[in-house]
Amino acid sequence: YSINLWKFGDVASDDAVKGGNDGDQAEIGYIDDFTAQSDNGVIAEFWQNTYETISRANNVIDGIKNTPMDATKKEQMIAEAKFLRAYSYFQLVNIFGEVPLKLYPQNSDKNIYVGLSSVEGIYTQIEKDLTDAVVLPVSYAVTETGRATRGAAYGLLAKAQLYQKKYGEALTSIQNLESLNLYDLDSYENLFKLGNENSIETIFAICFLSNQVPTCSNALNQWLAPSIESGYFFDNPTQSWVDIFTEKQTDGSDDLRLDASIGRDGKAWLNDNTFSSSWSSTGYLVKKHNQPLSEVDAGRKGDGGLAYIYLRYADILLMKAECQNELHHPDLAEAPLNRVRNRAGLADISGKTESEMRSLIRTERRKELGFEFHRFFDLMRWGKEVATEALGPEFTWTEPRYYFPLPQTELDSNLGIK
């Protein structure tokens, strides 16, 4: 798994810019300013890695069908593969739009020169795979932490339905998830620390391990860290993101999510350091994906072991609030929204109109989920007016929404794409 989603979810959004040295990783800069062409290496790498995941999932789904083994274990393995296939297509459809929908093993005649499927068709397959995946176990032994669960299937299904504006169906999926009675909010400051990533709040996380051969580590620990810690200081938070934190906690202090998410000048950083604005192009760095040197020393900085939390319960609560509001029930959106706000130390919201509540929910998503690689996709699904206002003059909306170009390698080799 190559953890490149930040280059689209963060850098392409108004939450972050490329960062790093000016000449380093120039192709990420083209993602940042929407000038990426089909020969962009970032696009090619993401495409290749994601389709490799899909290929492996297809091999499992097809190959295990006639394998003599325990029926329950077989069902679980097929469901896990379908979940990972759905997760992969969910990323592809939201970055590229129409893509080849490959559902057979790589060596199958049906998998050669597969043309583009419609966005609607891809979402149909995503929903089918996730519906099949809800037979997954609700939990696993500690030694198998990181496997997809029933809650993960319901949660990703709800997200896919929300993205299609199927608000009622998304609420049903959320209700199914909540009926498992497994998830709750945890301490925000501790969510992104080693050992806490799979807390009661985590629904699906992609796990990594340090000190492994071959490597299975999280290199974000180096990509996003300051140079004084042997980091490359990419994914720099914008002033625009910092400026949304105007609302104080009920005790008058800053929203606790601000300093839990980023480093700011004069504030405590990792390793008993005080953050300096000189460490990045914007004056800020992402804190969420960094480990202290006591866990991963500077000499092996890229060998991080911190999990990437893709889906957590706070996201589900905000999705629930959004669905209720879009179904014209702003009053029913208050409870899930306030649970997230209260955890951050903020006061309750009540008595808002549908329009006011929509704005509040969108701002709350930006605060709560900052630098977890969701923002760009939220902007796209909220439409032209929201996206163009947030992304500024560098961004040009294209109907039905902006998609990044397919990689040239695929265009050259796949004769099914006309």
Give the predicted meaning of each segment.
Residues Y1-I28, Y123, E127, T131-P137, ...:
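An aromatic- and glycine-enriched ligand-binding surface/loop that stacks and positions planar moieties
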Residues G19-G23, N40, T50-T53, Q125, ...:
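Long, intrinsically disordered, low-complexity segments
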Residues D22-F96, N111-I112, L116-G121, L130-V142, ...:
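Conserved, well-structured interaction surfaces
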Residues Y30-I31, T35, T246-Y313:
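Flexible, polar/acidic helix-loop-strand segments at domain edges
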Residues Y51-I54, N58-I61, I78-A79, E120-V134, ...:
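Hydrophobic core segments within long, regular secondary-structure runs in both alpha-
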Residues K73-A79, A141-A152, L191, S350-T353:
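A glycine-rich, coil/turn loop motif that links secondary-structure elements
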Residues L317-K320, L327-L346:
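Active/binding-pocket-proximal capping segment
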